[in-house]
């Protein structure tokens, strides 16, 4: 009999807790509190993810701590699913960023990551939109200028290459650290996951 890959909303929410730090260890009670779900239900999903070798656990006193199984290449694909789930739920609740994504996603070659106040859910009426673009190519700044004018918003854009992103993660660069801890991937989820996976998988 094959394993059952029953991936639902709760599974995505659990895995999303690990997308900011692939080395994170977290116990059941904290997971349940973070995703606002009953501990018993969370425990069922954690057991399933552990049986699938996506998570692994260690006993710390009376608590069981869970962390990503970075030795399983399939875990990377679960992280991509978790990031995608986060993006979908975020865009459905944030019309401005959803509109922005529609305006620029097909015009910019590379991954696009939202960070700053909008990614943290702290944006105000006059907040700027902060974007990181991961690309090997130059960006046509006119696209950003035109989009900012259409939306009536200031758009701050920073660029980096996949290699520089990986170096930034490795060197604990303050900006890259901020982005990995609070982000929404608007395009190119696999690019961010790959960069973080390479670093954390080699530690």
Predicted regions and their residues:
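Short beta-strand->loop micro-motif that forms the acidic, two-metal-ion catalytic signature
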Residues: 131-133
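Catalytic core of pol beta-like nucleotidyltransferases
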Residues: 1-108, 120-126, 135-203
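Short helix-loop-helix/strand-helix junction enriched in hydrophobic and basic residues
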Residues: 110-118
């Amino acid at each position: 009999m094959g394993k059952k890959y029953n991936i639902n909303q709760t599974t995505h929410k659990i895995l999303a807790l690990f997308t900011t730090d692939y080395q994170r260890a977290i116990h059941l009670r904290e997971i349940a509190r973070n995703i606002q779900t009953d501990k018993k239900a969370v425990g069922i999903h954690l057991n399933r993810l552990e049986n699938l070798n996506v998570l692994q656990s260690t006993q710390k006193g009376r608590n069981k701590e869970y962390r990503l199984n970075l030795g399983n290449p399939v875990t990377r694909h679960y992280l991509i699913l978790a990031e995608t789930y986060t993006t979908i739920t975020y865009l459905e609740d944030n019309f401005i960023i959803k509109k922005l994504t529609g305006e620029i996603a097909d015009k910019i070659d590379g991954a696009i990551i939202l960070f700053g106040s909008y990614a943290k859910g702290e944006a105000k009426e006059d907040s700027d939109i902060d974007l990181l673009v991961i690309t090997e190519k130059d960006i046509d700044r006119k696209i950003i200028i035109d989009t900012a004018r259409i939306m009536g918003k200031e758009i701050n854009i920073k660029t980096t290459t996949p290699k520089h992103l990986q170096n930034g993660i490795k060197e604990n660069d303050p900006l890259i650290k901020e982005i990995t801890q609070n982000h929404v991937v608007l395009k190119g989820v696999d690019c961010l996951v790959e960069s973080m996976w390479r670093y954390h998988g080699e530690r």
